[in-house]
């Protein structure tokens, strides 16, 4: 699994002009799944994400986690995170998981975050979405479950 994590002051996702997910302080997370991913990958990244100290304390040091600040997650499925652009001019998406596998792991990952006490808003899997966010910092990380 691959995540693009952005620390935000607010974020929203809409489908066809309708807002389907919206958060205040927290993390906007694009979630990519490859065919080799399992529940263990989802569990590893869920645990890592909620405890990653990327929010600033009173001394302006990145010392607080999502759980520490009571932040939320806006989770958006993003198969293009596994796009390969090495050959030609059109990305190849063969490394991305098939939709049924990706949906199952994406939903499982969201459930794991909720089980840790995090409020999770989502986009709509497989839909064309518009994402708006205010990146705080800016602070952005790429996280992979496999090295």
Swiss-Prot record:
EC number: 3.1.1.96
Location of this chain's protein in the cell: Cytoplasm
The UniProt record lists the keyword Endoplasmic reticulum: no
UniProt GO cellular component terms: cytoplasm
Keywords: Cytoplasm, Hydrolase, RNA-binding, tRNA-binding
Biological process, per Gene Ontology: D-amino acid catabolic process
Principal cellular location given in the protein's record: cytoplasm
One Gene Ontology molecular-function label: Gly-tRNA(Ala) deacylase activity
Reaction catalysis annotation: glycyl-tRNA(Ala) + H2O = tRNA(Ala) + glycine + H(+); a D-aminoacyl-tRNA + H2O = a tRNA + a D-alpha-amino acid + H(+)
Main EC class the enzyme belongs to: hydrolase
Presence of the UniProt keyword Transcription regulation in the record: no
Similarity remark: Belongs to the DTD family.
Function (record text): An aminoacyl-tRNA editing enzyme that deacylates mischarged D-aminoacyl-tRNAs. Also deacylates mischarged glycyl-tRNA(Ala), protecting cells against glycine mischarging by AlaRS. Acts via tRNA-based rather than protein-based catalysis; rejects L-amino acids rather than detecting D-amino acids in the active site. By recycling D-aminoacyl-tRNA to D-amino acids and free tRNA molecules, this enzyme counteracts the toxicity associated with the formation of D-aminoacyl-tRNA entities in vivo and helps enforce protein L-homochirality.
PANTHER family named in the record: D-AMINOACYL-TRNA DEACYLASE 1, D-TYROSYL-TRNA TYR DEACYLASE
Written domain comment of the UniProt record: A Gly-cisPro motif from one monomer fits into the active site of the other monomer to allow specific chiral rejection of L-amino acids.
HAMAP family listed in its UniProt record: Deacylase_Dtd
Name this protein carries in UniProt: D-aminoacyl-tRNA deacylase
Originating organism: Bacillus licheniformis (strain ATCC 14580 / DSM 13 / JCM 2505 / CCUG 7422 / NBRC 12200 / NCIMB 9375 / NCTC 10341 / NRRL NRS-1264 / Gibson 46)
Lineage: Bacteria, Bacillati, Bacillota, Bacilli, Bacillales
